Amino acid sequence: MITEAGGEPVHCGVAPDDAAGLQAALARCQNAELILTTGGVSMGEADLMKAALSDGLRFHKVAVQPGKPVALGRLFGKPTFGLPGNPVSCLVTFQQLVRPVIRAMLGLARPFSPVIEAVLTAPIRKRPGRALLARARLHRGDDGAVHATPARSQSSGAMSGMVEADGLVILPLEAGDAAAGEMVRVQVLRWRFMDRAEPGYWREGAEAEAPYGSSAPGSGEDDACC
């Protein structure tokens, strides 16, 4: 994921579940331009990343599912993300938070993945109070519209739905259940569902829409992947 975003990953090892070992592992990362960790950001006794970031902590937890237990701070003067240890939550928070930062640090003008509209083929249950990024498969229907079929399980432990997902259906904080047939916004993860005529396609001179409504100006360079 780091390579696809344009970065160069450097693995600094696995940290033990104790404060001294974690600090030693983090010290090995101090020459990086951006530090990423996975795990240790929730509420367990061994979740030590929040404390490690205490002096430079910017936020801990976001109102998004999956991916609530995520942290951002600074270590050694470098931006540092503490991503959830759950694989699905880690993948989603990387896509939403880390990938745009890497691309912005590289000076790329379109950090966000494109967002399109699609017709929901099955209902998605959701309670207001937290945004939901629901994994879905996309296909183009006989009507020419893109249709989004949500994964059967939206559990953050269901990796199969993430592997098969072509996009993430965006249901905002205040939204409730989404019904079949409803038009929804989808963040595209796989290019084959992008038509060059559709808003959000990263063509020369175009603008890519950010997942939550803001946009980034196009630069004329042609990205190979979203």
Stretch-by-stretch model annotation:
Residues 52-205, 212, 225-226:
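Flexible glycine/proline-rich
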